[in-house]
Amino acid sequence: MKWDEPPLWPVAVPSLAGFAAACIPYVFPNTPQLVGGELTTPFILLMIMSPLLYFSPEPTGGRAELILGANIGMFFAFLPQAIFFVWFIIVILLWLAQSMYVWRRNYPAFRIGTWIGLGAVSGLFIGGLFGHLILV
């Protein structure tokens, strides 16, 4: 998939969804925690919401590949955080770098999905910091 101009939805929608999911436990304090960790429940919510990519605009390519790529991108971006504390910085910088040039080249739907997954988890990390530092 190659766009003629920078697209807004693959950058804004996943990162805003991750940001909102990370802020939910802070806005609604009685939110049930499915498993331990502040961001694990919002991450599971993002995984549950990933099939909504099926309704993405047509030019993105294969819908199943897009969803699979987003899920793998989210796992790649989220799971190392348990071991490597500053992993979120790497994920956010990688997503920003990808956002600058991924739209200029012709990539398959799976690669676009990994970019979307990185954006969702970047929003999750930024929303977690925002919730912990501002909303508490």
For each predicted feature, which ranges?
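Membrane-helix boundary connector in multi-pass membrane proteins
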Residues: 78-115
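Membrane-helix interface motif
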Residues: 27-28, 88, 136
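Lipid-exposed faces of alpha-helical membrane segments in multi-pass integral membrane proteins
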Residues: 13-20, 90-93, 123
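Membrane-associated alpha-helix detector
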Residues: 1-80
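The cytoplasmic-loop to transmembrane-helix boundary for the fourth helix
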Residues: 115-122
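Juxtamembrane boundary at the C-terminal end of a transmembrane helix
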Residues: 124-136
